[in-house]
């Protein structure tokens, strides 16, 4: 059974629409949330080149929206391109310094670079701003 068969019908249509757009070398409009969902969908399947294609399309539609750049940084971290990831995270830092996903993305990237003190610093900041029910999950990363 394919991964797609477990997706809600509406999201399957979004995936098919995006893939048709890419195949036909067209440009369709997707809202930012749809694009972020597509990025997660492809990243979760380790289809990083497709996820980066979604990122590029999103950047064309929404310039350099910080949430899109954050997702791009997460993809580069997953691909092991850590310096590229950190460069993007630094670029959006003034907009995201108190954003949990941004803090966690930094923690993961710096941890993979074996810069553990920096990683721990980001995790501690994440714990400070996190909802109480999420603190234990973040503490496990320490």
Regions from the PLM with identified roles:
Residues 37-38, 72, 106, 142:
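Structural register within alpha-helical repeat arrays
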Residues 63, 97, 131-133:
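Short coil turns that delineate tetratricopeptide repeat
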């Amino acid at each position: 059974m394919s991964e797609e068969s477990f997706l809600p019908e509406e999201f399957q249509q979004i995936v098919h629409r995006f893939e048709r757009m890419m195949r036909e070398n067209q440009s369709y409009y997707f809202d930012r949330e749809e694009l972020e969902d597509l990025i997660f969908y492809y990243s979760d399947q380790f289809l990083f080149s497709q996820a980066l294609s979604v990122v590029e399309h999103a950047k064309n539609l929404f310039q350099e929206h910080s949430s899109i750049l954050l997702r791009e940084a997460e993809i580069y971290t997953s691909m092991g391109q850590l310096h590229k990831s950190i460069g993007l995270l630094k670029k959006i830092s003034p907009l995201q310094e108190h954003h949990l996903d941004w803090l966690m993305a930094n923690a993961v990237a710096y941890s993979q670079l074996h810069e553990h003190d920096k990683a721990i610093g980001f995790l501690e900041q994440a714990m400070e701003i996190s909802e109480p029910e999420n603190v234990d999950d973040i503490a496990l990363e320490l």
